[in-house]
UniProtKB/Swiss-Prot annotation:
Free-text function comment from the UniProt entry: Increases the activity of extracellular murein hydrolases possibly by mediating their export via hole formation. Inhibited by the antiholin-like proteins LrgAB. In an unstressed cell, the LrgAB products probably inhibit the function of the CidA protein. When a cell is stressed by the addition of antibiotics or by other factors in the environment, CidA possibly oligomerizes within the bacterial cell membrane, creating lesions that disrupt the proton motive force, which in turn results in loss of cell viability.
HAMAP family attached to this UniProt entry: CidA (MF_01143)
Record-annotated membrane-spanning stretches: 4-24, 26-46, 59-79, 88-108
Membership in a protein family: Belongs to the CidA/LrgA family. CidA subfamily.
Gene Ontology cellular component list: plasma membrane
Pfam families per record: LrgA
Keywords linked to the UniProt accession: Cell membrane, Cytolysis, Membrane, Transmembrane, Transmembrane helix
Designated name of the protein: Holin-like protein CidA
Segments forming a coiled coil: none
Compartment annotation: Cell membrane
Membrane topology: Multi-pass membrane protein
GO BP annotations, alphabetical order: cytolysis; killing of cells of another organism; programmed cell death
Species this chain originates from: Bacillus subtilis (strain 168)
Length: 128
């Protein structure tokens, strides 16, 4: 029961933090979405131990675990615009497939380059 209460409190804190950042970005007329700024600020606060990971870990883990639930409204929105999907559905699907493929290839290539660079660095340092 204590873990559940702690999780709910942490989710509430994350929600309040998100709303606060969205409010500040709207107030300052910043063109970057509040969610992006919030992620950067939260990462910075965590990195410098201003916010301890334990303070938000359970809530964040639950939110990540239930992430699929947050995409249901988007799926319902797609279904609501069936006429647009019937006209452009194939094009949208092709864009999604091609962009996913490009991201996968780019990520794989970059990962291989980084691994080779680390291997080369490790080999050079062991020769000394």
């Amino acid at each position: 029961m204590k873990k559940l209460l702690l999780t709910v409190i942490q989710i509430a804190l994350l929600f309040i933090f998100a709303r606060l950042i969205n409010w500040v970005t709207a107030l300052l007329h910043i063109n970057i979405p509040g969610s992006i700024i919030g992620i950067v600020i939260l990462f910075t606060l965590l990195h410098f131990n201003i916010i301890k990971l334990e303070w938000i870990e359970l809530g964040a883990a639950w939110l990540l675990g239930e992430l699929l639930l947050f995409f249901i409204p988007s799926a319902v929105g797609v279904i609501e615009y069936g006429d647009i999907m019937s006209k452009f559905g194939v094009s949208i699907l092709l864009v999604v497939i091609i962009s996913t493929f490009v991201v996968m290839v780019s990520t794989g290539t970059l990962t291989q380059l980084i691994a080779k660079r680390k291997e080369k660095k490790h080999t050079c340092s062991s020769e000394l």
